[in-house]
Structures are given as C-alpha cells and as structure tokens.
C-alpha cells in the first residue's frame, strides 16, 4: 500500500551538499549553487546588454540602463549627492537579494533568502558598513547620534540606551523581514500543492475537480510572490540607503 502524501512545508528549506563528494568536502550546498547561478545571470545580462552600447538600445541594454538609473536614482534621492559613492554596494545588494527571491520560485531551485543565516549576514554587513561610514565622516562625534540635540541631559541615562538598542535592532529587523516573507510564501506554496494531491488521493475522480481551488490559489500566489520578490529587494535596498543617509548626515 502506497504511503499517502503528507504536508512537509519546511522540508524545502533543508540544506544538502551539492556537487557530490566535492560539495561535502568544501561544505558547498544548494544554497551556494543558486548564489553562484544568480550572480552569473546578473553579470551575464550586464555583459551582454552593454557589449554594443548602441545609441538605440536593444532589450538587454535597456534593461541594464533602467536598472542602473533606478538604483542610482534611489541612492541620490535617499542619501544625497554622496549616494553615488555607494551605488556599487546598493546595486550589488539589491540584485543579490532579488535573484535569491526570484530563482526560488522555479521548481527544484532554492531560495537562499529564506535562511536567516544569509539575510542576517547581509544585515550585519550593512550595519558594519553604516557604522564605518559614520565614523569615517564624523569620527567620535558619531556617538552624539545616540543623544538627540536639544534633549534634556537629565534624560541621557534613559535616551542613550534606547537609541543604542534601536540602532542595534536595525540588522535584526532587516534580516527577519526578508527571511519571514520568503519563508511564508514558500510554505503556502507547499501547503496548497500537497493539498491538491491529498484531495485527489482521497476523493478519486472528484478530487481532480476539488483540487482546482488550491491549484488556482497556487497560481495566484505565484503572481503575488513575484511582487513580493521585487518589493522585498527594494525594501532591503532603500532601508540600507536610509541608514547610510543617517551615517553621512548624522541625523
């Protein structure tokens, strides 16, 4: 008697070594494989799109130019003229997150942004960069950021710890927001997909008709997850720009 399908919504997030014995030797997982693939896709599109640099751009060149203008505009709008210096970092960060979100929507691919180790690592990188930029621009005066101008000095023992906790909570909120959104979407995919097979197995021919509802929900969810993939990459990038603005202008 065949075992009935069960819902294992979190099984898709388990890591395993890719590349056979070599992958196990260097601890190279399917998460790393998708990171490499995503990076190769972005670099390939940029290289192909800008190869000819035509006056009348083709589709790939237009895509690259739109991406460049979008991220550059984001940097300048949020950080100011100094934002141009941080364009390479924001551009890389945005597309690294975006590719992790998008590639995971394909069957047999892995969403590396669904692991808090990845999103947490990115968030720590952001906060370290922001702190380094603030110290580079303002030196020890950076620490005045934790005590707003005009605040009563008597409240310093209360305000300073609150501001420090608020500052240190930035990488936590950055990482959990992205991680939680990616996990939630893929768990819903798995639940609805497994539910379709459960209905077919339990109800026979009638189950095919009953499975239309969860199938329709899954198709709708794909469109929603596409939107979420872009939105979460944008949120991660714009919050990084806002933090860099605070570091540059100290307010």
From Swiss-Prot:
Keyword Mitochondrion set for record: no
Pfam family, one: ATP-synt_A
Alphabetized UniProt keyword annotations: ATP synthesis, Cell inner membrane, Cell membrane, CF(0), Hydrogen ion transport, Ion transport, Membrane, Transmembrane, Transmembrane helix, Transport
Localization annotation: Cell inner membrane
Purpose of the protein: Key component of the proton channel; it plays a direct role in the translocation of protons across the membrane.
Quaternary assembly: F-type ATPases have 2 components, CF(1) - the catalytic core - and CF(0) - the membrane proton channel. CF(1) has five subunits: alpha(3), beta(3), gamma(1), delta(1), epsilon(1). CF(0) has three main subunits: a(1), b(2) and c(9-12). The alpha and beta chains form an alternating ring which encloses part of the gamma chain. CF(1) is attached to CF(0) by a central stalk formed by the gamma and epsilon chains, while a peripheral stalk is formed by the delta and b chains.
Recorded family membership: Belongs to the ATPase A chain family.
Name of the protein in question: ATP synthase subunit a
Species the sequence originates in: Granulibacter bethesdensis (strain ATCC BAA-1260 / CGDNIH1)
């Amino acid at each position: 008697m065949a075992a009935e399908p069960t819902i294992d919504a979190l099984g898709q997030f388990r890591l395993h070594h890719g590349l056979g014995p070599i992958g196990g030797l260097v601890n190279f997982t399917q998460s790393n494989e998708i990171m490499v693939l995503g990076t190769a896709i972005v670099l390939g599109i940029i290289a192909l799109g800008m190869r000819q640099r035509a006056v009348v751009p083709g589709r790939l060149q237009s895509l690259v130019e739109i991406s460049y203008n979008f991220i550059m505009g984001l940097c300048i709008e949020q950080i100011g003229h100094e934002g141009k210096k941080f364009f390479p970092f924001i551009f890389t960060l945005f597309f690294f997150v975006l590719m992790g979100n998008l590639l995971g929507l394909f069957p047999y691919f892995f969403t590396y942004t669904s692991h808090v180790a990845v999103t947490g690592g990115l968030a720590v990188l952001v906060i370290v960069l922001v702190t380094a930029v603030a110290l580079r621009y303002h030196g020890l005066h950076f620490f005045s950021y934790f005590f707003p101008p005009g605040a009563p000095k008597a409240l310093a023992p209360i305000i300073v710890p609150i501001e420090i906790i608020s500052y240190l909570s930035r990488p936590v909120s950055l990482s959990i927001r992205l991680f939680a959104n990616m996990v939630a979407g893929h768990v819903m995919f798995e639940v609805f997909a497994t539910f379709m097979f459960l209905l077919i197995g339990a109800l026979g021919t009638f189950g095919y008709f009953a499975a239309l509802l969860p199938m329709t929900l899954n198709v709708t969810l794909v469109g929603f997850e596409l939107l979420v993939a872009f939105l979460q990459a944008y949120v991660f990038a714009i919050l990084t720009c806002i933090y860099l603005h605070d570091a540059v202008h100290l307010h």
